[in-house]
Amino acid sequence: MPLNSSMECKNYDYDYDSYQPYFYFDNEDEDFYNHQHGQPPAPSEDIWKKFELLPTPPLSPSRRPSLSDPFPSTADKLEMVSEFLGDDVVNHSIICDADYSQSFLKSIIIQDCMWSGFSAAAKLEKVVSERLASLQAARKESSRTESADICRSVGFLQDMSTPASQCIDPSVVFPFPLTDSTKPCKPAPTPASTTLPLDTPPNSGSSSSSSDSESDDEDDEDEEEEEEIDVVTVEKRKSVKKSDANATHQSPVVLKRCHVNIHQHNYAAHPSTRNEQPAVKRIKFESHIRVFKQISHNRKCASPRTSDSEDNDKRRTHNVLERQRRNELKLSFFALRDVIPDVANNEKAAKVVILKKATECIASMQEDEQRLISLKEQLRRKCEHLKQRLEQLSCS
C-alpha cells in the first residue's frame, strides 16, 4: 500500500483510559475517515461501515498523577513507555526523536481503525499533543533539578493514594490469578508468621509426617502472602503441631527389616518328575508351614512399622505365595503327563495337549470300566448257575 508523505503529522497516544472509542453512526452520510487528497482508502474502511460496534466495557481510572505535576513519577514513565508498541529502540526514538515519530505516525496503518480504533481524529490529536507537550516540559525541568528522586517518590505515593473505590475489581477483567506479579509485592512477615516454620515437628521418616510437613509449608507460604493473619488459626496450628511432636517423641518409630526367604525355581532345569513324585505331598506340606511361619513373623515385625513398610511386606509375601502356587501347578501338570500314556514320553507337551489327552484317557477308562463291570456280572451269573448244577448232581 503506498504511503502519502505529505499527510499531516498526527501524534496519537495509545492510552485508552483517556479516550474511549465508540462506533455509532447517527448520520449515515458522514464519512468515517477524514480523507486527504490523493490518499487511498484504508484496508478496513469499507468493512467497518457495515458494522456497528458496541461500546467497550468500563475501564479503570488512570492511576497516574495529573498532567499538571511538575515531575512525572517512575510509574508514570513506565506506563508511558509501555504505551508504545515496539522494542526499546523504537520507544526511545518515538519519545525523543521527533523526525522518526513523525514518519512513524504518518503511516496509514497507524490511522486505520483495525489497528488504532480511532473514530474522532481531531479530539485525539488535541489530547495527545497536549499530553506530549506537558510530558516533554516536565522532563526538561526534572533534568535541571537535583531533587528528582524525591519528586519521583512523591509521585509514586500519589499514584498509590488513589481511592480503591474508583477502581474495577481485576478479577472481573482477568479471571485467572496473577500470582507471578503479586509475589514480589507480598508484605513483610509478622512475628507470628515467622515462628510458624520453627514449630513444625522433625521428620520421622514416614510418608504421613512428610506429607503433613509439606502441607504445613504450603499453608505457611499462603499465610505469608496474605495481608491479614488469623491469630486463632495460627494458635490452633501451633497446638496441633506441638501435640504431633509430643506424640512422635512418645512413640518413636522402630525400623526393622524382616528377611523373607524367596525360593527361586530354576525353570531351565530338566524336569525330573518321575523321581520327585513320592515327595510332592511332603514338599507341599513343608512349603505351607514355611509360608505360615513367614506370615506370622511378618505380622510380629510389622506392628511398629509404617504403612509403606507394611505394603512392601504384603507385596513381597504375595509374590512368594504366587510363585509357590505356580510351581505346585507346574508339578501337578508334570505328574498328570506321566500318567497319560499318549504324552508320557513327550517332555515338551503343552498344558492344553495334556488336558485334552487326559480327558480322552478318562473317557476311555470309563468305557473300559463299564465293560468290565458287565463282564463281571456275566461271570457271577455263570458261576451261580454252575454251583446249582453241581448241587443237583451231588444229590442225585
From Swiss-Prot:
Q: Where is this region: Leucine-zipper?
A: 372-393
The answer to whether keyword Membrane applies is no
Task: Please note every region of biased composition (Acidic residues).
Answer: 213-230
Assign the protein's first listed, main location to one coarse class.
nucleus
The family database entries (PROSITE patterns) matched by this protein are listed as:
BHLH
Q: Where is the composition biased (Low complexity)?
A: 191-212
- What remark about domains does the record contain? The 9aaTAD motif is a transactivation domain present in a large number of yeast and animal transcription factors.
Q: What is this protein called?
A: Transcriptional regulator Myc-B
List the lineage, top down: Eukaryota, Metazoa, Chordata, Craniata, Vertebrata
**Record gene name:** mycb
